[in-house]
Regions:
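Conserved phosphate-binding elements of NTP-dependent enzyme cores
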Residues: 1-835
């Protein structure tokens, strides 16, 4: 029943017959003007409803109102598979994995804080006279567009405007074009193996970037090409690397054929060959060919600041723009607050306005826990969670109204201490007259919602239904709800048994001593072997530096007999032979990688079907059953299961292949059956369409396949279909799938490191994950988890808490001990939330 306000405006978005991905003809009303949470186990259809229906339809309908000319220049969402969606506002989505920004992007540009800072330095700085070099006091003339009269020489000059201080514009360093780095040819990479002769390919660029006949041109230049490169004279080596571009007459014989050709050819030395290829590179592929011959260095002219000398000249309170940009946001806020008071009375009103614009933007970012980031930090180095929070802060700053914001797990990478800031941002969006739909698993976020929609009851084919809906109280009281026990605080946090402190280090230690790196102070780390160890702390406290930049590289270097990173001063890890990083990066680069291929069962399935009577009668071999290269792959989609349609004026549309219906196989494959133990006859396309759990029931006679499927089931991945493309898996699913090959082996010599493995996991899925950790620990492994999730932290044997804050105020081990000891430690911010 549609709810109508007194003024006859609709109160909810009405969704009818939604069938996107796993949704089962869903009918649901989503309240407008409220904070609506979408909950459910992983793979239950949450994102399909929020992003695949609400955002897709909201953005598509808005874009359809624009002109054709404009639409052609925008990325458009395809029409959602839904019967009807009524009253959906224009929609914006804040995705779980925002795009990684380019080389010209910094934290300051992404947040637009740098705009305010540039204006501050243009209007409020002391400027240098270009005629005599005298520094002149700040003046209102700059804001009025009037020239400054130099106090020393009396000549007029104009101060630089804000645009003249931008490293993406007029303020760019001319040497590096505003990137802060320069690319130089790495001569060591040009000839990596000096035992080879030039004829044998010693000079790599001539083989990969230039015509092969350059070897003969070098010979004509007086260089011996048939002796090892190390035996060349200094003069010959100089010709190879720096020789002049002169024409030489050569007799060229192609590799194939006996004909000779006389050619006049200009000599390209090895260095120029690379420089020429770099200048001509027009795309990523071209740059990739050249990249291995280049090395990136900090620009010597600007020192990596990206700014020209003129842009670095204005000063405010003794700092130039580059120095102010190098400060963390926390430090920059304190500095900006002090600027108006440092100026004359006539300048203060304008200074206050400019500084307030900076501080208003900064306030949101500080609430979201990003105060430790420096303004000049490269955007590409920000974590997924950091980029998402920048995106969120920018959205709330725009003060729009009547917009539908769809947030996909905004609590990713967020320490419990920063959740209140996130909730404040979402509340402000609603207060401005917007609607917010948030997909999340964090119980604190869900409890703060005005309305909850829970999808389920399980993942995959059996999910896709709305199982509970209403206020938090309504859902908590619903017997069908699977999130209800966690909303009601009735669930026990502790799933694993407690390890007595007296026995914590019975299996040994991993000890590491480091010197300072980034903002992390010198550390002495002691990790108990054969235990589950959680590394915690607020964002920017040094968790990644300690584990991913120190512990993992040091362990891997030790195993390989190589030198550890310079900042790792000592490592005691006797008996550790393997260090495995299990992260959430997507598996595979394209749709040809599936669960079956990654789990290494597809080859066994192909061989099994090739042994069937029908396959033998048709002359089909195991290789023919490959959907990538085999004769039985669908000729229409070439084994991908989908085709892309080029629609003029509209975005390309990927649709299920009309011939194979997504199975990836030609019709001939449907005629080849294999009989299971229970007498069922199945084709390979039918088996690939089954979930892991369904396939388990019909592969009992295939020992290796059955064992690997059992492992996937035990990892909580029983709902995935065998033919599911691996790049489409969530971060948590990808992590567990990567573990499949490690389960069931003795692991006493191994360390497993997980980087926020609870991303995308429902509290029930977290329990499954804890079971996986338990199995690894039981097999002897040392498991180190970088984590914010309180349930995982509470179930760890040992906790190392970094902090106390982020950036310069962090970088130390605040506390180490059992979860109970951390909870009792007054210095631990994490401990407050464990009590």
């Amino acid at each position: 029943m549609q709810r109508i306000r007194d003024d006859a405006r609709p109160e909810s978005i009405e969704v009818r017959g939604a069938r996107v991905h796993s949704l089962k003809n869903v009918d649901v009303d989503v309240p407008l003007g409220e904070l609506v949470g979408v909950a459910g186990v992983s793979g239950s259809g949450k994102s399909s409803l929020a992003l695949g229906v609400l955002y897709a339809e909201g953005s598509r309908r808005y874009l359809e109102a624009l002109s054709t000319y404009t639409r052609r220049r925008l990325t458009q969402a395809s029409r959602a598979q839904v019967d009807e969606v009524l009253h959906v506002p224009a929609a914006l989505a804040l995705h779980q994995r925002p795009a990684v920004p380019g080389i010209r992007s910094t934290f300051g540009t992404m947040t637009e804080l740098l705009n305010s800072l540039r204006l501050l330095f243009s209007r409020l700085a002391s400027h240098v006279c270009p005629h005599c070099g005298t520094r002149n006091e700040p003046t209102l003339n700059v804001a009025a567009g009037l020239p400054i009269v130099c106090a020393n020489c009396g000549k007029d000059f104009h101060a630089p405007g804000a645009e003249s201080l931008a490293f993406n514009s007029a303020g760019a360093c001319p040497a590096c074009a505003g990137t802060g780095i320069v690319r130089e040819v790495n001569r060591a990479a040009l000839v990596p193996d000096e035992s080879k002769s030039i004829d044998e390919g010693a000079v790599l660029p001539w083989g990969s970037l230039m015509w092969d006949l350059m070897k003969q041109v070098a010979g004509a230049m007086g260089v011996r090409t048939d002796v090892p490169f190390k035996d060349l004279t200094p003069k010959e080596r100089d010709i190879v690397f720096n020789g002049p571009a002169v024409k030489k007459h050569i007799l060229y014989k192609p590799k194939k054929g006996d004909d000779f050709a006389e050619l006049d050819f200009t000599y390209f030395n090895a260095v120029y060959t690379v420089e020429n290829a770099l200048a001509k590179a027009k795309d990523e592929k071209g740059l990739k060919r050249v990249a291995r011959f280049l090395e990136e260095k900090t620009c010597p002219d600007c020192g990596g600041t990206r700014l020209s000398e003129a842009a670095r000249a204005p000063r405010v309170r003794g700092l130039n723009l580059a120095e102010a940009s190098a400060m963390t946001l926390d430090a920059a806020v304190d500095w900006v607050r002090s600027v108006p008071g440092s100026l004359g009375a006539d300048m203060r009103p304008m200074a206050t306005n400019i500084c307030e614009s900076f501080l208003d933007v900064a306030r949101r970012l500080l609430e979201l826990g990003l105060g430790y980031l420096a303004l000049d930090r490269a955007g590409a180095t920000l974590s997924t969670g950091e980029r998402q929070r920048v995106q969120l802060a920018r959205a709330v700053r725009n003060r729009t109204t009547g917009v539908l914001y769809v947030l996909d797990e905004p609590s990713i990478g967020l320490h419990p201490a920063n959740v209140d800031g996130l909730l404040g941002v979402m509340r402000d969006l609603v207060a401005d007259g917007n609607s917010v739909v948030v997909v999340d698993h964090d119980v604190r976020v869900l409890k703060a919602c005005d309305h909850l929609i829970e999808m389920g009851p399980v993942a995959g084919a059996e999910g896709g239904h709305v199982i509970a809906q209403g206020t938090v109280g309504d859902v908590a009281a619903n017997p069908r709800s699977r999130i209800a026990p966690f909303l009601a605080d009735g669930e026990s946090v502790r799933e694993r048994g407690c390890m007595p402190v007296s026995h914590m280090f019975d299996l040994g230690h991993i000890r590491m001593t480091t010197s300072q790196l980034h903002t992390v102070k010198p550390l002495d780390v002691d990790i108990p072997r054969g235990r589950l160890v959680a590394v915690t702390g607020v964002s920017g406290s040094g968790k990644t530096t300690m584990v991913l930049e120190s512990l993992i590289p040091a362990l891997k270097a030790r195993s390989a007999g190589e030198k550890p990173p310079e900042h790792v001063r000592a490592l005691d890890a006797d008996g550790i032979e393997r260090a495995n990083l299990i992260d959430a990066t997507p598996i595979g680069a394209n749709v040809r990688s599936t669960v079956a291929t990654y789990a290494d069962i597809h080859d066994d399935l192909r061989r099994a079907f090739a042994r069937s009577d029908e396959a033998k009668a048709g002359g089909w071999k195991a290789g023919d059953f490959s959907y990538n290269t085999g004769r039985l792959r669908c000729p229409t989609c070439d084994g991908t299961g989908s085709i892309s349609l080029d629609v003029q004026f509209l975005p390309d549309v990927d649709i299920e292949c009309p011939d194979c219906r997504g199975s990836r196989y030609a019709p001939e494959a449907d005629a080849i059956h294999r009989t299971t133990k229970d007498g069922r006859e199945l084709t390979l396309p039918q088996l690939m369409a089954m979930s892991v759990d369904q396939a388990l029931a019909v592969t009992g006679d295939m020992r290796k396949v059955h064992a690997r499927l059992t492992t996937l089931h035990d990892l909580g991945l029983g709902y995935l279909t065998l033919g599911e493309p691996t790049p489409a898996l969530s971060g948590g699913e990808a992590q567990r799938l990567k573990l499949a090959s490690e389960m069931g082996r003795a692991q006493s010599h191994a360390v497993f490191v997980f980087d926020e493995p609870t991303i995308g996991l429902h509290p029930l899925d977290v329990r499954v994950l804890l079971g996986v950790f338990d199995r690894l620990v039981a097999s002897g492994a040392t498991v180190v988890v970088i984590e914010h999730d309180l349930d995982v932290i509470a179930n760890a044997d040992w906790v190392i808490d970094m902090g106390p804050g982020g950036g310069e105020s962090g970088g130390r081990i605040v506390a180490a001990g059992t979860p109970e000891q951390i909870a009792a430690d007054a210095n631990s911010i994490t401990g407050r939330y464990l009590r």
